[in-house]
């Protein structure tokens, strides 16, 4: 793929910037703008919700202008936003900059996934998904360590400089991504001129089923950051350091073996639906183990070892599911309306992230094991749904490398063979 190294390097650099502020977001913006924590929290919540409403427009923009152009525009907006944050000392100024930045942040995953669809085909999509995820984890971890060191040396006043450093990271990432060259399928230009919109997405029942299945799995993705710390503190009565240890293990495994695990899955020839289902089942196994641990409540040493083992299983589920699930959604979307399709798919993650705090805390108040039970059922249901959807999805979505019979008889969307064709 032409420009692949530039894309990977750009994503890694931008991830360092993200890692410099995400773990300290409220504190970061409080010190950069001088506004109170309460005001910062309200502004970030409101602008984040508005950003969700903007996501369908981002999908339409991708379909009209192409993912690369929109990707570069979002990098420019994010760079400008962080460069302006130190000057946004008043509430209206901070709200304006936060809103513009939130629109770009919320839209970025859609555009990034669409860009992967533009620059890679077949098994290369799975490989690129895994490489990008590993770099994002490594970059965010490096960014968090970097800002921790900067704050230790120069104090909270250094937040202003990290904001500018973040702006610089986004600008450099944009310059690197500008070197990427999308690959077009024959007839794409004509397809883009054909009338299409969100009605087409809403009529695609298999893709909506895929989105619903991903919502169930996405609740599990939110568990590590939202449920895990509360569960340790309120049900297991463990030290806060366990949360830090869990995050460290998860980040290290994602960055260190993510590409290896995804490569092993890809070389096995497994269908993407089945790989994603396996990832969901590994999630379910980890959640059931949490129920067992919460029932037994052993001593602190045993709890520590058990929790770390559970995090390893959970992370393996993430590493198996993420590349396959991402490539599955990208490949199931018709190229002419891929932006709209992926905007719809991304809502599954956004809704899960928005619902997770209230859902988990409400269930946890009843019984510490209850949220894990709900998550285990959800993950198992997602796996079953993926297997059921397999025969209704396009063959090029289900298979990283479609069988020869399918490739030879490939047709445009609407007449294309599904995975069931390969069973004959």
Where are these regions (language model features)?
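Juxtamembrane intracellular "pre-TM" segments in multi-pass secondary transporters
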Residues: 1-4, 180-213, 406-414
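Helix-loop boundary and gating motifs at the non-cytosolic
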Residues: 1-48, 206-250
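Conserved MFS/SLC helix-loop-helix module at the cytosolic interface between two early adjacent transmembrane helices
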Residues: 52-89
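Helix-to-loop junctions at the C-terminal end of transmembrane segments
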Residues: 54-66, 151, 256-273, 364
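Structural signature of the two symmetry-related core transmembrane helices
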Residues: 69-84, 274-290
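Cytoplasmic helix-loop-helix junction between adjacent transmembrane helices
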Residues: 97-138
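Transmembrane alpha-helix termini and helix-breaking/packing motifs in multi-pass membrane transporters
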Residues: 142-161, 234, 354-374
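C-terminal membrane-cytosol helix-exit motif in multi-pass small-molecule transporters
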Residues: 148, 168-187, 385-389
């Amino acid at each position: 793929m032409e420009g692949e190294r530039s894309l990977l390097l750009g994503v890694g650099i931008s991830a360092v910037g993200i890692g410099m502020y995400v773990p300290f977001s409220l504190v970061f913006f409080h010190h950069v703008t001088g506004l109170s924590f309460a005001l910062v929290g309200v502004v970030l919540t409101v602008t984040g919700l508005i950003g969700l409403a903007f996501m369908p427009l981002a999908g339409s923009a991708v379909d009209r202008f192409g993912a690369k152009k929109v990707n570069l525009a979002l990098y420019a907006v994010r760079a400008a936003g962080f460069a302006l944050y130190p000057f946004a000392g008043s509430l209206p100024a901070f709200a304006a900059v936060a809103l513009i930045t939130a629109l770009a942040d919320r839209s970025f995953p859609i555009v990034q996934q669409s860009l992967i669809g533009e620059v890679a085909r077949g098994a290369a999509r799975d490989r690129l998904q895994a490489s990008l995820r590993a770099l994002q984890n490594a970059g965010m971890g490096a960014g968090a360590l970097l800002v921790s060191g900067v704050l230790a040396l120069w104090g909270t006043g250094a937040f202003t400089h990290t904001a500018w450093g973040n702006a610089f990271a986004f600008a450099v990432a944009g310059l690197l991504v500008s070197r990427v060259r999308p690959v077009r399928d024959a007839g794409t230009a004509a397809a883009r001129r054909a009338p299409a919109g969100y009605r087409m997405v809403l009529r695609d029942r298999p893709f909506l089923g895929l989105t619903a299945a991903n919502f169930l799995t996405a609740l599990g993705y939110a568990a590590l950051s939202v449920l895990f710390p509360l569960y340790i503190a309120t049900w297991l009565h463990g030290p806060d350091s366990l949360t830090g240890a869990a995050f460290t293990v998860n980040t290290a495994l994602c960055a260190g073996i993510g590409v290896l695990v995804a490569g092993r899955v890809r070389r096995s020839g497994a269908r993407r639906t089945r790989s994603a289902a396996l990832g969901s089942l590994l999630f379910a196994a980890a959640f059931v183990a949490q129920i067992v641990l919460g029932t037994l409540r052993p001593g602190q040493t045993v709890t520590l070892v058990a929790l770390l083992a559970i995090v390893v299983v959970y992370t393996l589920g993430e590493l198996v599911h993420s590349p396959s699930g991402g490539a599955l959604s990208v490949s199931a979307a018709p190229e002419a309306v891929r932006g709209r399709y992926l905007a719809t798919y991304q809502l599954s993650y956004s809704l899960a992230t928005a619902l997770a705090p209230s859902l988990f805390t409400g269930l946890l108040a009843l019984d510490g094991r209850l949220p894990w039970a709900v998550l285990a059922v959800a993950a198992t249901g997602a796996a079953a749904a993926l297997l059921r959807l397999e025969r209704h999805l396009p063959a090029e979505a289900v298979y990283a490398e479609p069988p020869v019979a399918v490739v030879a008889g490939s047709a445009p969307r609407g007449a294309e063979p599904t995975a069931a064709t390969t069973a004959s």
